[in-house]
């Protein structure tokens, strides 16, 4: 019963995330969420004390899901290049849900709401994201795959620019998310002195036409 209850609560937060991302916390009502879920408001109040409690659970569940994806990434790869490539690919594949999460976190950071558990979850999310990158970069340097670099600084650079890419994709109608992600990946490889197959092919083509 506990699992069924938890599952139902998570389902409500998934719909709530869509609405909070589409609009914002202030303009979304419990009734809006209930209507979108096809339930009455009493059911939502059964699981959550109020809208703020639902908002907290929505962000926390979205971050938990993202962190589970990151955990699975670590488990799949021992090779630092493969892990970084998969990290980029995963963020591209899940860009829709990531944009929703970024939008809601952005709205939260600019609001008057302050919930310590949400702040901790957000900080943990970025800590884990950066650690995947910095640990992989560090291992690559130790193995002689990458040139010497500052792993933490590069990880912060990529993480920060990923947020910028996700925001740009929400604002600019003609924005090409695939190209932006590919460019960010290439910038990282250049900083590390590592030429991926895609970059090598481009350089060979440039040389042939020179």
Can you say where each PLM-predicted feature lies in the sequence?
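Generic hydrophobic, amphipathic alpha-helix propensity
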Residues: 8-17, 33, 58-62, 66, ...
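Short, structured helix-loop boundary elements
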Residues: 9-10, 30, 52, 56, ...
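Helix-turn-helix
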Residues: 11, 19-53, 57-58
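Short coil/turn segments at alpha/beta junctions that flank glycine-rich nucleotide-binding fingerprints
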Residues: 22-26, 76-77, 98, 143
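Conserved hydrophobic residue
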Residues: 25-26, 118, 142, 146, ...
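Hydrophobic alpha-helical connector segments
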Residues: 57, 68-100, 154-158, 181, ...
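Amphipathic alpha-helical packing segments from all-alpha helical-bundle domains
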Residues: 64-67, 71-72, 97-100, 116-142, ...
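Amphipathic C-terminal alpha-helical segment
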Residues: 93-97, 107, 111-114, 135, ...
């Amino acid at each position: 019963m506990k699992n069924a209850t938890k599952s139902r609560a998570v389902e409500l937060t998934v719909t709530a995330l869509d609405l909070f991302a589409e609009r914002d916390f202030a303009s979304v009502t419990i009734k809006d969420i209930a209507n979108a879920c096809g339930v009455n408001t009493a059911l939502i109040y059964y699981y959550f004390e109020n809208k703020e409690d639902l908002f907290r659970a929505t962000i926390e569940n979205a971050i938990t899901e993202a962190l589970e994806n990151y955990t699975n990434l670590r488990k799949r790869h021992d090779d630092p290049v493969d892990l970084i490539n998969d990290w980029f690919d995963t963020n591209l594949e899940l860009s829709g849900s990531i944009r929703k999460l970024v939008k809601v976190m952005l709205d939260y950071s600019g609001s008057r709401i302050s919930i310590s558990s949400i702040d901790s979850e957000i900080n943990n999310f970025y800590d884990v994201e950066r650690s995947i990158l910095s640990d992989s970069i560090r291992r690559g340097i130790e193995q002689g795959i990458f040139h010497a670099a500052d792993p933490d600084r590069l990880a912060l650079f990529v993480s920060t620019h990923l947020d910028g890419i996700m925001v740009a994709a929400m604002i600019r109608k003609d924005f090409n998310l695939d190209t932006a992600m590919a460019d960010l990946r290439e910038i990282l490889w250049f900083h590390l002195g590592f030429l991926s197959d895609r970059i090598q092919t481009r350089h060979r083509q440039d040389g042939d036409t020179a």
